[in-house]
């Protein structure tokens, strides 16, 4: 075989052996065995292990003589030897402590590229070993070398050049100068710029995972991946944001987080010009333009743009909730939901709006809030022209037009257009109310409801209407209010043609025609078309009146009733009729009043065909035709027992 080249390594590390088969007693096998035996038998005091024992050089003619099996074995052995030597570079501190080489000399093993004609496979291995520094060879001055056969050694003298403390810093740096990726794995066309990366890449095909976590038993391809994973168990977060103090497990997470404060969005969509702070978000966004939904749910057939969305969706079918809050015991289907929930207990709000000073628990809330200041709404519905500030809102809105309701309740069979609505609905069946108000003790099923409720006590109304100056507790209330000024009503009832300013109002209205009442009181059996009405009704049984007027002390069961009552004291009437100028204290009263001008009569009695402007009048009419209280003496019927008693007292029935 060809001549051997020298490369010296000072080491006492041993390598795990692995068997090779294919042909007997080949020099290639001896090379691998020599590396193991040399490293196992020698100690620090024995001296140096030479690469002479483990490296084999072939000439062009000799290489041609090898059969395919021998060439494959050669590749496997040399890759393993190389990866073992690379592991020394990453772990050993020998080079820092022992003065083996002069600072003017570098011993470099340079394995030139070779190519197999039968298979598309290339290999290039190179490593630089010296005492303190790893130097970038691309800018060496006075490069001198010799090449004899397929592998060569270069001894280089160098001047002042950029240096790197560890090989893992130098190796990625060298790839900047040459975009060459000489390592190609035969299973698929996937090029790697470093031999060690090829070794790691091969493990993805062989499913080989040597690094096991002692905490949970999970296996990983590399020691780096294991170290990253272990931070979940230790809770280590060494990277801290100087702006808000939030800590992160990884530096990359800190870099991404800092963009929230700086507002930097380097990733721009070429289709619509929208910019993102993360490349991942741009990739997700671009799928909206393409319209490709390649991930399909086997359970319900729903398709998704991204695999992560499919994985999250499938949890709805399984009902799995592996993430549990240690504070209140509440379980979640996703880790990020648990993280969000825990902030309710801590009260931490690190994300502050620079415009109005409002603070938020999560960065995405701040991002969405900032859109209220800019008024930007780039996502427009092709069906009705309504615009939205985020793509997810447009997708959810589109379901109103299509009627799609993929989320079904297993208890009552009711379907919803959003998974969030299903989660909220399910709490009606369980009666779960984990969120309690510290002020009045009232409990809520959802954290958002508690936040809104607390504003009743604090009186906080941070959302102001620019048209009339009226303030609201939430952005949602402000959005609904603004429709009164614009008069926009894009949602129309197919049954009677009535239009509404929001889709939820249309859904609730349609129940008048269908007679559907899915919300039933467990106390008295009375059913309601809206969950909100059931909640209000239940207070009749409990007698609960937590909302008290500061002016006169009158108590109410519901916050909305208190707000309406307070207008009696202030005489506030902000809703004016454009037809006659009459003002009203609430938007509902204005809507009812306007029917006198339009002559609109939406409510029809099925018994006699008579129509009414208000539902309450229809109910009254039905009651008039049903007189359950009869006077035994003459048989006259009455609506209420008080009337029959009065007639008895005055002897009118005698």
Curated annotation (Swiss-Prot):
KRAB domain segment(s): 49-122
Keyword hit for Ubl conjugation: yes
Source taxon at top rank: Eukaryota
Record keywords: DNA-binding, Isopeptide bond, Metal-binding, Nucleus, Repeat, Transcription, Transcription regulation, Ubl conjugation, Zinc, Zinc-finger
Broad class of where this protein is predominantly found: nucleus
PROSITE patterns: KRAB, ZINC_FINGER_C2H2_1, ZINC_FINGER_C2H2_2
Zn finger residue spans: C2H2-type: 183-205, 211-233, 239-261, 267-289, 295-317, 323-345, 351-373, 379-401, 407-429, 435-457, 463-485, 491-513, 519-541, 547-569, 575-597
Cellular-component GO terms for this entry: nucleus
InterPro entries membership: KRAB, KRAB_dom_sf, Znf_C2H2_sf, Znf_C2H2_type
Covalent crosslink: Glycyl lysine isopeptide (Lys-Gly) (interchain with G-Cter in SUMO2): 256, 452, 564
CDD domains recorded: KRAB_A-box
MF-aspect GO terms: DNA-binding transcription factor activity, RNA polymerase II-specific; RNA polymerase II transcription regulatory region sequence-specific DNA binding; zinc ion binding
Subcellular location: Nucleus
Function of the molecule: May be involved in transcriptional regulation.
Record family assignment: Belongs to the krueppel C2H2-type zinc-finger protein family.
Identification of the protein by name: Zinc finger protein 283
The species this protein was found in: Macaca fascicularis
């Amino acid at each position: 075989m060809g001549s051997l080249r020298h490369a010296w390594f000072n080491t006492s590390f041993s390598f795990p052996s692995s068997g090779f088969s294919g042909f007997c007693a080949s020099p290639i096998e001896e090379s691998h065995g020599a590396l193991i035996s040399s490293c196992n038998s020698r100690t620090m005091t024995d001296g140096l292990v030479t690469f002479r024992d483990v490296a084999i050089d072939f000439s062009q003619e000799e290489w041609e003589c090898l059969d395919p099996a021998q060439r494959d074995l050669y590749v496997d052995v040399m890759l393993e030897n190389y990866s073992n030597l690379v592991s020394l570079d990453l772990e050993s501190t020998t080079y820092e402590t022992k003065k083996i080489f002069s600072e003017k000399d570098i011993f470099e093993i340079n394995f030139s590229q070779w190519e197999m004609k039968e298979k598309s496979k290339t290999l290039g291995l190179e490593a630089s070993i010296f005492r303190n520094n790893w130097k970038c060879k691309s800018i060496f001055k006075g490069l001198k070398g010799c090449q004899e056969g397929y592998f060569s050694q270069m001894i280089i003298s160098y001047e002042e050049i950029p240096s790197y403390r560890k090989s893992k810093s130098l190796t990625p740096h060298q790839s900047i100068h040459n975009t060459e990726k000489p390592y190609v794995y035969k299973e698929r066309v996937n090029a790697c710029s470093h031999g060690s990366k090829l070794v790691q890449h091969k493990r993805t095909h062989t499913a080989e995972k040597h690094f096991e976590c002692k905490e949970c038993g999970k296996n990983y391809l590399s020691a780096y991946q294991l170290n990253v994973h272990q931070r979940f168990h230790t809770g280590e977060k060494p990277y801290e944001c100087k702006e808000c103090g939030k800590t992160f497990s990884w530096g990359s997470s800190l870099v991404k987080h800092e963009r929230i404060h700086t507002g930097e969005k380097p990733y721009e969509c070429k289709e619509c010009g929208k910019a993102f702070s993360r490349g991942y978000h741009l990739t997700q966004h671009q799928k909206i333009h393409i319209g490709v939904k390649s991930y399909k749910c086997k359970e319900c057939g729903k398709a998704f743009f991204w695999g992560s969305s499919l994985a999250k969706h499938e949890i709805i079918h399984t009902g799995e909730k592996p993430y549990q809050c240690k504070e209140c015991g509440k379980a979640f289907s996703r880790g990020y939901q648990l993280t969000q929930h825990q902030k309710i207990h801590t009260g931490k709000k690190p994300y502050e709006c620079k415009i109005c000073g409002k603070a938020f628990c999560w960065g995405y809330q701040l991002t969405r809030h900032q859109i209220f200041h800019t008024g930007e709404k780039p996502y427009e519905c092709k069906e009705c022209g309504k615009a939205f500030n985020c793509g997810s809102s447009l997708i959810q809105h589109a379901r109103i037009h299509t009627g799609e309701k993929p989320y079904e309740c297993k208890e009552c069979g009711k379907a919803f257009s959003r998974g969030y609505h299903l989660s909220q609905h399910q709490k009606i069946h369980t009666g779960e109310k984990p969120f309690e108000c510290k002020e009045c003790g009232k409990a809520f099923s959802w954290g958002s409801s508690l936040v809104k409720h607390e504003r009743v006590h604090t009186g906080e109304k941070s959302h102001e209407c620019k048209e009339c100056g009226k303030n609201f507790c939430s952005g949602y209330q402000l959005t609904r209010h603004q429709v009164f000024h614009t008069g926009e009503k894009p949602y129309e009832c197919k049954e009677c043609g009535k239009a509404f300013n929001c889709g939820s109002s249309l859904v609730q209205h349609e129940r008048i025609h269908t007679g559907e009442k899915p919300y039933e009181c467990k106390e008295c059996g009375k059913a309601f078309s809206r969950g909100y009405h059931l909640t209000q009704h239940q207070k009749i049984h409990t007698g609960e009146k937590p909302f008290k007027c500061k002016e006169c002390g009158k108590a109410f069961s519901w916050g909305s009733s208190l707000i309406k009552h307070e207008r009696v004291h202030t005489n506030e009437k902000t809703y004016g009729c454009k037809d006659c100028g009459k003002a009203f204290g609430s938007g509902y009263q204005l809507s009812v009043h306007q029917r006198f001008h339009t002559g609109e009569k939406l409510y029809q009695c099925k018994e006699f065909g008579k129509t009414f402007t208000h539902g309450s009048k229809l109910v009254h009419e039905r009651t008039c035709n049903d007189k359950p209280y009869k006077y035994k003496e003459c048989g006259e019927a009455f609506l209420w027992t008080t009337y029959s008693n009065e007639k008895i007292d005055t002897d009118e029935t005698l």
